[in-house]
From Swiss-Prot:
Transmembrane segments: none annotated. The lineage of its organism: Bacteria, Bacillati, Actinomycetota, Actinomycetes, Kineosporiales. GO terms for biological process: translation. This is Small ribosomal subunit protein uS12. Part of the 30S ribosomal subunit. Contacts proteins S8 and S17. May interact with IF1 in the 30S initiation complex. CDD domains: Ribosomal_S12. HAMAP family: Ribosomal_uS12_B. Residues 1-32, 105-124 are annotated as: Disordered. Belongs to the universal ribosomal protein uS12 family. Keywords: Methylation, Ribonucleoprotein, Ribosomal protein, RNA-binding, rRNA-binding, tRNA-binding. It comes from Kineococcus radiotolerans (strain ATCC BAA-149 / DSM 14245 / SRS30216). One of its GO terms (cellular component) is small ribosomal subunit.
Amino acid sequence: MPTIQQLVRKGREDKVVKTKTPALKGSPQRRGVCTRVYTTTPKKPNSALRKVARVKLTSGIEVTAYIPGVGHNLQEHSMVLVRGGRVKDLPGVRYKIVRGSLDTQGVKNRKQARSRYGAKKEKS
């Protein structure tokens, strides 16, 4: 434990908090343009074809973003909204595309957790 004199001389050093989403530059979301839409395989022990897109953000940084939900309408030059949030079994994927905003359509026939996937309430 330091003495008061040592604290007067040096002071306490603040902990450096490292951001998990540097490409968003402090924003909650960023707009971007898809440069490539493709599928990739997750790391062991999982097996699938995960849908991802390379997105050039308005902050000038190009990132890999995951496309959540079943089916999508994205292609090259689509305008998308990107939020933070990693995909645990895809190394290097630290962002997700927001469904139901800009050029991205919501998930069809979605009954539960609709707001996460941009799905409208079904007419009963």
